[in-house]
């Protein structure tokens, strides 16, 4: 599970950055999601190192009523619902 989106990170622009999300912290009040970015999906699949992305943490209010199959799906649902990545292609 991942998404692609145009992204600028550390002075470089990526047309279809490949981004994976996972929960870094979660409690009853907040959920912190860490994003890991590669230039492309092919780079990720070929074992390339992630790009430097200093803006990699997102904090959201924990929604105990939000339905998700697992913690990873919950993280992606929060990121998608935030509206930050409006040009993203989800579930790649």
Please give the residue ranges for each predicted region:
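Viral virion structural and adsorption modules
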Residues: 1-92
């Amino acid at each position: 599970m991942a998404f692609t989106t145009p992204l600028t990170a550390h002075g470089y622009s990526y047309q279809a950055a490949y981004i994976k999300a996972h929960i870094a912290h979660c409690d009853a009040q907040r959920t912190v999601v860490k994003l890991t970015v590669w230039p492309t999906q092919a780079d990720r699949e070929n074992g390339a190192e992630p790009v430097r992305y200093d803006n990699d943490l997102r904090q959201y209010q924990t929604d105990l009523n939000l339905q998700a199959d697992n913690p990873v799906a919950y993280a992606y649902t929060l990121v998608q619902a935030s509206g930050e990545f409006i040009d993203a292609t989800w579930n790649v």
